[in-house]
Amino acid sequence: PAQISRESGRRRLVVGVNVEGRDLGGFVKEAQELIAKNVELPQGYNLQWGGQFENMQRAMARLMIIIPLTILAIFFLLFMLFKSLRLAALIILVLPFASIGGVFGLFFAGEYLSVPAAVGFINLWGIAVLNGVVLISFIKQLREDGYSMEEALLHGCGHRFRPVMMTASVAMLALVPMLFSGGPGSEVTRPLAAVVIAGLITSTALTLLVLPVLYRWFEEKEVEA
């Protein structure tokens, strides 16, 4: 060869691969399984995966720190808004409502959990929490105005149905072209769009149907306490 590369005093040979039409993480996982099954490296040789895959692994490691901090920040802001740990915890429950849909969205789109998908989850949680705040804050206001629990829940869901649906619908419709794109960059846009669209479907439905029930249960527990 025209050049012998070394790293840490050892010879190094770089094999480059261009991945097109599928996600990088899934390709590397499949390649690792095939190499482990069919290739036996001689003594003194080792194999490392670098390039974009290494960068993706580093980004995922950072996201594993950022995501818990994001959830804590959301909880803190909710507590500052409502001055109640119970209501903050109640609205935080929309996160699993949204995450369920996001996971199913990745599955049905044939995508894997990647950096774009993780960013999609963070965006999704923000929209889902916003819808939860819109609904619960109005129900809480009705209760303070003297409405009974049943009246507050019925009026709250009825009057906040359109704002919640509009917020979710606009976000979903804006991402539809990204979900069905197939050109360069689609490996980044498709996972993000799949997570947000599917997550908003489940979070919106469960926010309107389940969150009022949980609000009643939380308030009854507070009265008992």
Question: Each predicted region: which residue ranges?
Answer:
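Interfacial helix-loop-helix hairpins and adjacent transmembrane helices
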Residues: L154, P184-E187, V213-A225
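Extracytoplasmic/periplasmic membrane-proximal domains and adjacent transmembrane bundles
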Residues: P1-T70, F79, E150-A152
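Non-catalytic alpha-helical coupling and interface elements of nucleotide-dependent molecular machines
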Residues: E20, A36-E40, P68, L77, ...
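Alpha-helical transmembrane segments of integral membrane proteins
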Residues: I65-P68, V115-F121, P191-A194
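Helix-termination/interfacial motifs at the ends of transmembrane alpha-helices
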Residues: M64, G182-R190
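Hydrophobic transmembrane alpha-helices and their membrane-interface caps
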Residues: A73-H159, M165-P184, A198, T202, ...
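Structured binding elements
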Residues: P96, V188-A193
